[in-house]
Amino acid sequence: VITQAVDVLKKFEGFSAKAYWDVNAYRIGYGSDTITSSNGSVRSVKKNDVITKQQADLDLARRIPEFEKVIIKQVGTEAWNKLPDQAKAGLISFAYNYGSIAKKSLRDAIKTGDLNLIADTLVSSTYNDNAKLSSSVRTALRNRRKYEAELIRTAKPNIISAGISIKTILGASLLAVAFSLLSKYIKA
C-alpha cells in the first residue's frame, strides 16, 4: 500500500526543496507541513527551510501510515482491510490532500466496499470544494480526484482481502487437478 501511495502522492504533490506557503502553513518536499529527520524527530516547516529529496522521502514514508490510521479510525478496520491495496492508495492520496476523509458520504461509501460507489462518491462529494481557488488549481484538484477515483474503480481484489487464503487456492487447485484426472480415468 505504501509504495503505491508514495507513487500517487509524488505524482500530484510534486517536489519542492524550498519551503512555500500553501493555504494555512508552510509546505516542503511533497506538500508536507513537517520535516522528519534521520533520527525520527519531526518538526514543523519554517519559512526558509530547504530539504533534499531523500529527506522528503523519509517524511512521506512516515506520514503515509499516519493517514492510513486516520482513515481506519474513520471507516473501521474491517472495511479498510477489505479494500484492495490500489484503492487504499487512492484513498490515502485523498486523505493526504484533505487531511482526512471528512465527508460522511465518502466514509459511508467506503464502508460498503463497493469500489464504483467509492470512486463516484470521491469525485462527486468534492466537486464544489475549493470554489475559492483559482481555476487552474481547481482543475488540477479535479484531475487528481479523477485519477484517485480511477485507481479505486480499477483496483483488483487482494487475495486475502477478498476472503480467499492461499490454503483455499491451493486446495481448489489440487481439487481441480484430481477431478480432471478422475474424469479422464472414468472416460477410459
Locate each region found by the language model.
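Structural recognition of the beta-strand scaffold that forms the well-ordered cores
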Residues: 27-29, 90-95, 117-122
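Substrate-binding/active-site groove segments that recognize
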Residues: 22-45, 65
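Short, exposed beta-strand/loop patches in secreted or surface proteins that constitute
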Residues: 17-19, 48, 110
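Alpha-helical scaffolds flanking conserved acidic
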Residues: 2-6, 82-92, 117
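Long, amphipathic alpha-helical surface segments
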Residues: 3-8, 12-15, 32-35, 54-57, ...
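Alpha-helical segment that forms one wall of the substrate-binding/catalytic cleft
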Residues: 42-78, 85-89, 93-105
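Short, low-complexity, charged amphipathic interaction modules
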Residues: 165-187
